[in-house]
Design a protein with these regions (language model features):
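A short glycine-rich, Lys/Arg-flanked "PGG" loop and its adjoining helix->strand segment in the class I
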Residues: 77-89
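A conserved beta-strand element that flanks and buttresses the S-adenosyl-L-methionine
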Residues: 65
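Short amphipathic alpha-helix with an adjacent loop that forms part of the alpha/beta core around
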Residues: 56-58
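Class I SAM-dependent methyltransferase SAM/SAH-binding core
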Residues: 2-53
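Conserved class I S-adenosyl-L-methionine
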Residues: 92-121
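Local beta-strand N-terminus motif with an aromatic residue
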Residues: 61-62
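Short catalytic micro-motifs in class I SAM-dependent methyltransferases
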Residues: 68-69
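Conserved Class I S-adenosyl-L-methionine
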Residues: 10, 121, 128-190
Length: 190
């Protein structure tokens, strides 16, 4: 089995996957040279790459993993066409993403109470994005919560987001630990 992870970040998922699944060849890519460096430090075969222009031959992988990253891609159809191109017949894409109501309790405190900004690939829109490219699409919903032990943790999380980091100063007084509901979905597309 040959696995490709696109948008591998620091390699945490890749390391965990390889520790519990034996006999796979695992390749990971990320656009950030720093993320590639950190993934390599974990022993991951990580390479600099762009999901919109994969540098692999057609039909190279049995599985492509895309965890919480497809909503960052400027041209989602191009990325999906590349994923389909490198998948072998019978292969699958497993893509995780968040729901539009992710951390509503937090975001309602800042930025005029807006929910999470609309994502190009979310729990709500993911199936529609995948259906033109795959014969079967299954959505598995995961509900939970993030518990932030301190205000510093909440602020650090806000700063880490691409769309809301600049709003950290709008955060009013909060009671900690602070709890925010999570909604995530995993899509399995074949």
């Amino acid at each position: 089995q040959d696995v490709l992870e696109v948008g591998c970040g620091m390699g945490g998922f890749a390391a965990r996957f390889q520790s519990i699944v034996n006999g796979v060849s695992y390749t990971a890519i990320d656009q950030s040279p720093r993320m590639v460096e950190l993934a390599r430090a974990r022993g991951i075969d990580a390479r600099h790459g762009d999901v919109q222009s994969l540098e692999f031959p057609d039909a190279s992988f049995d599985l492509v993993v895309a965890n919480w990253m497809l909503y960052h891609v400027p041209d989602l159809p191009k990325a999906l066409s590349e994923i389909v191109r490198v998948l072998r017949p019978g292969g699958a894409l497993v893509a995780a993403t968040m729901g539009d109501d992710m951390h509503t309790e937090l975001w309602s405190l800042i930025n005029s109470g807006d929910a999470t900004p609309e994502l190009s690939f979310s729990a709500e829109s993911g199936a529609d994005a995948l259906r033109p490219w795959f014969a079967a699409v299954e959505r598995i919903d995961l509900h939970g919560a993030t518990v932030f032990p301190s205000r510093d943790d909440v602020e650090a999380y806000i700063r880490s987001t691409m769309t809301r980091g600049h709003l950290v100063d709008e955060l009013p007084h909060i009671t900690v630990p602070f709890r925010a509901r999570t909604t995530n979905s995993v899509f399995v597309a074949t």
